[in-house]
Amino acid sequence: AVKRHRKSVKKSYVYLSGWMVAALRSEFGPLPDQSMHEKTSVPALIEEIYTFLKQADARELRHLFVDLDEARANGGDVDAALAAIDNFETHVVPIIADIDAGFGNEEATYLLAKKMIEAGACCIQIENQVSDAKQCGHQDGKVTVPHEDFLSKINAVRYAFLELGVENGVIVARTDSLGAGLTQKVPVSQAPGDLADQYNSFLKTESVTDAAKVGHGETTLVRDGEIVKPVRLPNGLYAFKEGSGEDRVVLDCITSLQNGADLLWIETEKPN
């Protein structure tokens, strides 16, 4: 339709978003954007679209070759027919696939990314939410993972591209930190100022002046020589400091680009 309307598909692409696939392509019926649809739904749709675009090419090229045969048989303009074939513009456009938060750990992310690439995707978008607690980007209650977890998934997607011989595959790293006030776990810092330490600096904490008052099973950290206790919710999640979202986004973007991402997606905290 785009090619017929614009006479060209240049600068066009197909984007398969997770919310669209969840709403329209799940065997469970319409679902919210929470990674509850089958993980193979996206690769299946990629293959369907890619096959359809190639079939559109085959159909139009058949007509062009028929025109060439007729020109040769009837003394027509063979050069014009050949030029039409040589200048034919394919219907196939880049396919960008949303892998959500990877549908599992880094190995699961790698396997699913391979399926998407084999089906025809040249670009994969991945986000830093917790896979089994994923929310729609504009909803409250989002939970992010530490950088080490997210970067391992970016690497997993890159390995999938490289294993399939795709040297120029594109990875879009999406950060949901702007609207996320929670994290699933406290990463282990090996040295002051390392990535885990920077991540932990955004945690909402309470000062501990008396170690005897630390409750059973509670977590404590040492920050700048002071013992602090991260604020933990009854569900086990840890809270970030209020107003720290933008700073967390900046750190997310820098670390993603340093570790293999090609493009950045900063998800807004509300649909504005």
Q: Model segments located where?
A:
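Alpha/beta enzyme core
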Residues: 1-272
